[in-house]
Amino acid sequence: RKFNNGGNRKTKGALVATGCIVGVFVLTNAVLVASVLVPYGLGLPNYCGIGLYLLLSTGMVFFCLAGRTLRQEVRMTFEVTDRSVEEGRRQVARIVGRDTSNLSAQEVRTAALETLAENLSDGVVAPLFWMLLLGVPGMMTYKMVNTLDSMIGYRTERYERFGCWAAKIDDYANYIPARLTALLIVFAEKLMRWKRTSVKWLMGFVGRYGSQHASPNSGWPEAALAGVLDCQFGGGHNYFGVYFYKPFIGDYPRLLTTADMWRSLQIAMAVEMMMVGLMLLVMLIG
């Protein structure tokens, strides 16, 4: 708020975003190096430094991953919406940025599954992807990139200029992970054998709708999940009092059910396990 006023908001926003991102990368590296060197400097056995390093690294990894929490929130959203639309609106507001005060039960459920798909990329696949490339510091740095985007990367009058750099960095950081997430969703569905459609058809569906989203990345995992469920995502929503239209993803605007929620959660779990397996495979080969 201190920097987001007056002139040169775009430059100020770029400096703030760059400073935060570089700062997290440097600080994380420094902390992890110190966790090994400090015990050694104090004359402690080597395993003390190694143990501290592993403890801190593990804590950072779990801090960056949001798969379990997201699945719980989505499940709770469907459960409370079955009881009361008003409760569902309050629950889904915990995981989406849009105005939920006037959403119907169908829109609440749709918002929850859209968020599950999008954050399967942002909260699981992308952090692990950047960990694979740049280690734990890369994972923590990605977390900062994603956090900045969720805080200031909005196309509103207040943040359009100040947050544009943060939003652009987030777009670049998620470009490969978003498409990888869509691919993993398709493969996860094929492993579960829910649909008789081919991988080629599903990939064609993803390619047709993934690029139509207002975001260059969010549409890909959302299109993959919509294709798996035979449903429709998208439509207009209010964000901080501003109306945004998102093109529809899918051709079948049917009502979503609890069965769709459970299928989506199973897909999410499968994608997480496949991504971890892919990481281990690359590390072994490398």
Q: Which role does the model predict for each range below?
A:
Residues R1-M140, G153-G286:
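Hydrophobic alpha-helical transmembrane segments
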